[in-house]
C-alpha cells in the first residue's frame, strides 16, 4: 500500500477513536476497504484547492478531482440552489480526504462500546467497509462547481466566501438574528458582487453574528476602509486637480500634516451614494445626517457607556433597515472608488 494512503488510513482511525481509550496498536492490520479506483484516486487525484471555516464547526472546501471542482459543505446545506452549483454524488475519495484534512471529529455515536462492537470486532480484523466508518462522522453534502475557478489564490478564497454567504442566506439554520427577507436579499446581492476588494469575511461574519451591534460593526468595517479614499476623491473633484491620485494624496498629507477625520470623511463617503440607496435609511433625511447617524452609532457601540444602553433595546425592524442600508452601499462604493483602491492600496 502506498505510504500516503497508509498515513491517511492511520489518521482516519485516530480520528474515529479520538474520544475513546481504544488502543490502535491492538489492531495492527485494520484498514478501510477501498476499491482499486478509489484507492488510486485517494493516492493521486484529490487536491484541496481552498478551505474556509465559518460558523461553529462549519467547514467549506473546494477540491479538484479528475479535472472537475467540487464544493463540500455540511449536510444542512443540501437543498441550496446556486446557479454555479449542481448536486454531485458522494465521491468516496473526496469524503475520505475531507475528513482527514480538516480533522473532523466523530459524532457522539462513536462511543467506545459501539466501536468495539461494530468496527474493532477482532484484533485480527483487516478490512472495514467505508460505509461502516463514514456513518460515525458528521454528514456533508457535495456539489460540482460549473464555473471556472479564478487563478489567483485570494480570488479563489473570495469565490468560496461568496458561495458560503449565499448558502447561509438560503439555509437559515445558522442564522441567529431575525433578518427580514429584504436584508437577506441584500446579503445575496453582495455575494453576487464579484469585487475582490470587498472584505467578504466581514460580510460573512456579520451574517453569522449573534447580536445586531456586532453584525453592524463588521459591515461598518467594510465602509471604514473607504473613508480616506472618499476624502481624497472629494478634494480632487473640489479642487479640479489633475495630479495623479497617489501624488495628490501625498501632497494632501504633507500639506495638512494630520490624519483624516472619520466623521467628516463619512459624510464625504455618503455623498457618493445614489438616492435609491440613501432612501433605504429613513433615520435621517440628507446624506450628511445619515452619515452622522451611522458614525455616531459606531462610536456608541465601540465606546459603550451606560448611557448608551438603549442600543440593546433597538427593534429588529430598525436594525434590519440599518444593516440593509450599509449592505447595499458596500458594492456601490467599492465600485465607485475602485481606482483609488488600486492607486492607494495601503490607505
Residue ranges and their predicted role:
Residues 2-201, 205-210, 316-347:
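Charged, non-catalytic interaction/linker regions at domain boundaries
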Residues 2-18, 180-347:
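Amphipathic, oligomerization/interface secondary-structure segments
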